[in-house]
Amino acid sequence: MFFPTLLAVEAAEKGGLFDLDATLPLIAIQFLLLVAVLNSLFYEPVTRAIDSRNDYIRTTQAEAQERLDKAVSLTRQYESEISQARLQAQQVIAEAEAAAARIRSEKLAAVQAEIQQKLEAARLQVEQEKQAALEQLQQQVDAIAAQITQKLLGSAR
């Protein structure tokens, strides 16, 4: 507290605010020494630490960007592979459905042909039985007609 007033009293005694004596260059030299000491002891280590931290951040950020790019690339590749697999699965399903439809139609055609064959065989059998029955009936009619004729001729005689 007394120090500023003492300076003011000294300045008033000498006659001016600034006297050009050895104190100004001494203060300038002290200031330059302080700057040099602070520069070597504080600013350079802090600057090196900041620079190394910035380098670390830059390299980490570059690595992260590379990993992100790789992840995006792998995602696209996997999505492409998945879509190709889905297309292949759809093709396999379509082929299986077509094969099943073809097998079903072949079996249906075979069954229909077998049924048609059996129907034709049954129709032929019925036709043969009908012909046999008609022949037997004709024989019976002929026999009855012969008996009737004999009775008529026998009674007419």
Swiss-Prot record:
GO terms for cellular component: plasma membrane-derived thylakoid membrane; proton-transporting ATP synthase complex. It is found in: Cellular thylakoid membrane. It comes from the Bacteria. The keyword Magnesium does not apply. Its main location: membrane. The chain crosses the membrane at residues 22-42. Keywords: ATP synthesis, CF(0), Hydrogen ion transport, Ion transport, Membrane, Thylakoid, Transmembrane, Transmembrane helix, Transport. It holds the Pfam family ATP-synt_B. It is a single-pass membrane protein. One of its GO terms (molecular function) is proton-transporting ATP synthase activity, rotational mechanism. F(1)F(0) ATP synthase produces ATP from ADP in the presence of a proton or sodium gradient. F-type ATPases consist of two structural domains, F(1) containing the extramembraneous catalytic core and F(0) containing the membrane proton channel, linked together by a central stalk and a peripheral stalk. During catalysis, ATP synthesis in the catalytic domain of F(1) is coupled via a rotary mechanism of the central stalk subunits to proton translocation. Belongs to the ATPase B chain family. F-type ATPases have 2 components, F(1) - the catalytic core - and F(0) - the membrane proton channel. F(1) has five subunits: alpha(3), beta(3), gamma(1), delta(1), epsilon(1). F(0) has four main subunits: a(1), b(1), b'(1) and c(10-14). The alpha and beta chains form an alternating ring which encloses part of the gamma chain. F(1) is attached to F(0) by a central stalk formed by the gamma and epsilon chains, while a peripheral stalk is formed by the delta, b and b' chains. This is ATP synthase subunit b'. It comes from Synechococcus sp. (strain JA-2-3B'a(2-13)) (Cyanobacteria bacterium Yellowstone B-Prime). The lineage of its organism: Bacteria, Bacillati, Cyanobacteriota, Cyanophyceae, Synechococcales. The gene is atpF2.
